[in-house]
C-alpha cells in the first residue's frame, strides 16, 4: 500500500543506483544521506495517513485477510548498507533517542570516546550557528567513521601509536609529544582517509586532479592535530607514495580479525536508532489501518535476513506487524516464531515452466522439491501460503486460453489439498515444543560482525557489500540451528531485551547458546550469570561478550571468569585436535576430533580443557554455582555445508550431543537409519495438544545461502536455491524410537499403530511423517445426524467422544459429505475443532440439493479414524 514510502529505494532501482553513484564521488556530503521520503518528516506521516485511510476504506467491507503496508521494504534497498537518514527530522529524533539512553551529552562523550560533548543535536539545530551545526553528534555516526575507528584500533594495537606507525612504515605524520597520546593523535591519518575516499580509483592522476599539489595536501593533513602534537606537513614526497601507503593501509585493514580496542558505539547507536525509528513508522502506518478497520491485520512482505541494515532487527519488527511474509533467509523464520509467536507468518511459492513445453526429468525433480518448503513452513510456524502467479506466463496456475491447470498448479495441488483437509489446522492450533535450548539473538553482535565481514570493502562498503551470503555471523547462527536440529532437538531464539527482562530465569530453558555474541550488555550478563548459578548450562563459541551493547571493546570477556578462560597472544597449535579428559557426559579422552580452531589466543584458567590442539584449548568446561559453562573454541559457520557432504568427518554432532547431555537434554524422538545410527539431515518437531503430542519428521535441507560465503554452490534455477541438497533427496527406511511406549497413530497414513516405543517407516525426501502420541488410546469419535432432513433447512451434525479427552486436548475433524450419486460435495466440507462433546455443527442445506441418501464422513485427524453416518434428504 505504501511502497513509495517504505520500499522506495528497492522498487526504484535507478533512484538507488543514482544515489550510490553520487555518494561514491562525494563521500563526506551527508545531505546525500537524507532519505527521501524521510520517515520522521511530518509530511510523510500526513501522506501515509491520507493514503492508507483511503485504501482501507475502499477495501474494509471485503474483510481482507491482511493489509500489506509494503513489500521488500527497508531504509535503503532492503538490507543493503546505507547511512540513512541525516535529515533534520531524524537528527532531532536521534537526539531524543540518545537523551533517553544516556541522560547527558557528557555521558555520550564518555561512551563514544569523544571529548567536549556539551549539547544535544536538536539544541544545536535550534542554535543554527555554523559552529553548532558542523559539530553534530550524528556526524560521528557514519559507516566511514566506523571503519576509520576500527583501523585506528588495529594499528594502535599493532604499532602503539602514530609514532610507531611512522617508524614501521617510514611515514612522517605529526606525532604527539612524549607521554601524550590518545585516539586524537590519529587525526592526520583520518584526514588523509577522508579526503581520498571519494576517489573511485587510487592513482597518482586522480589524486592530483582532485586534491591538488602534494605539498598543499601534506599541509592540510598536518593541521589535524591536537595540543599534544605540533602542526606540520605530513611530508609525503609524491602522490605515488600516497597511493602506495593507502594500498598497504587498506590491505592490512582487510586482514584484521580481532575487535581488540574497537569503539564503534556512535555507529551502533545510530544503526539501532534507525532500525527503531523505521519500525515506529511502520507502527504508525499500522495504527492508521486499525483506526479505519478494527479487524485489520497489517503486514509487511518480503522479510529479509536479520541484518545490520534495513530495519531487520526482528526484536523491533515483531512488535509492529500482525502478519509477515518472510523470505526464508538467515533463520528469520525461526527468529520470528521465537520472539513473537502471535505474528502470523506466510510464505510464497511458485513453479517456473515455459507454457507448452514438455516436462523434462529435471522439471519433474523440481516439481517434487517445490512443495517441500510448504511442509517445512507448517512445522516452523507458517500459517498460510501465497501462490506466486501474478499472471506471468511461466508461473500462472491456469492457462488463460484452455482454462486448464498448468504444471505450476499440478506441482502444488496434492499438497494444498491435503493441508486444506485438516492437518494444517491441527498443527497450527497445537503448541510447538522445544527441548529447553535457548539461542541468544543479538543485534549489536550482528552489527559488529558486519564490520568485521566488510573490512575488505572499507573504501567501497556501499557498493561491494550488503548480501546475507557474505555474513559470517549468519553462517554461525545457521550452523547452530542446523546442528541442534540434526540432533533431533529444538530451540527458541531469545532476544537481548528478553534476557534483560528475566526470560532465562523462568525455568523454561536448561541451556543457553551465545553464537559468537560479541556485544552483550551488563544487564544481560547479570541475567546469564544468574541462569548458570541456579543450574543452567551456558554454551559459547569463540567470541563471547568482549564488547558492551554499544560496540565498545571492554578489554576482557565479561563472562571469561564464568567459562574459566582468559585471552592472550597466539599459542602454537598442534597437527590435530585431541581429547584430553572425560567429564560427565563428555567422553573425549584419547579421541581424535575433527574441529576447526576459533581463537588461537585462548587459555584455560579455572576451566578444564577437555580437548586441545597443541597448547590451544578447544573445549573448556567450568563449574559455576549449580550450573556449568562450556566454551567451544570452535568455528561452526561451515557446518551447514559439512552436513550436506557425504562422509564429512566433522565431530560437531557427537560433541554437541554430549554437551547437551550435561543439561540432561536428549531427543524425545530419535530418527535412526537402517544401521541404527542417527539419520543424517532429519528434523523432528513436536507439538503439544493437551496430553497428546504430534510429531513431525522430515528431511531438513538448506533452503538459502545466508552465511554460505565461498562454500560451493550449484546453478540456481527459478525458485530453487543454489545449495546442493542431493544427499537428503533419497527415500530412507527409518526407525523412530521413543523413551517409552505410548499409543501411537500415523496421521497421514490413517493408521492406529498401537502402544509402541519404536516404529519402522519409510521417510519420503519431500514430505513428512506425522504421528500422534498419547498416554493411552484416544477415545473413539462418533458422528450422528438426523435420519431425515429437508432441503432449505438446517442440518445438525453431532460429534461425540466415547469418553472425555484429556484436559486441554482437542480434535480436528474433517467433515465431508457425499451426495446420493456417490460424488463428494465440497460446498459443505469443513474442518471442525472439537474440544468437548457433544459438539454440534450446524450447516444450512440448499433448496436445490439433490434428494436421496447422503453420507457424512468424519475424519479424525489425530487418529486417522473415519466415522460415518447417513441421512436422507427428502
Region spans (language model):
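A conserved amphipathic helix/loop scaffold
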Residues: 366-370, 386, 504, 515-784
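Aromatic sugar-binding surface patches on proteins
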Residues: 833-843
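Beta-strand-rich structural segments
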Residues: 793-803, 813-817
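Short acidic/polar inter-strand loop motif in beta-rich domains
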Residues: 776-778, 860-868
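Hydrophobic targeting/anchoring helices
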Residues: 26-33, 58, 68, 77, ...
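Short, aromatic- and glycine-rich surface loops/edge beta-strands on solvent-exposed regions
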Residues: 768-773, 851-862
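Polysaccharide-binding and catalytic clefts of secreted carbohydrate-active enzymes
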Residues: 33-46, 50-318, 323, 335, ...
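Edge beta-strands of extracellular beta-sandwich domains
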Residues: 782-783, 865-874
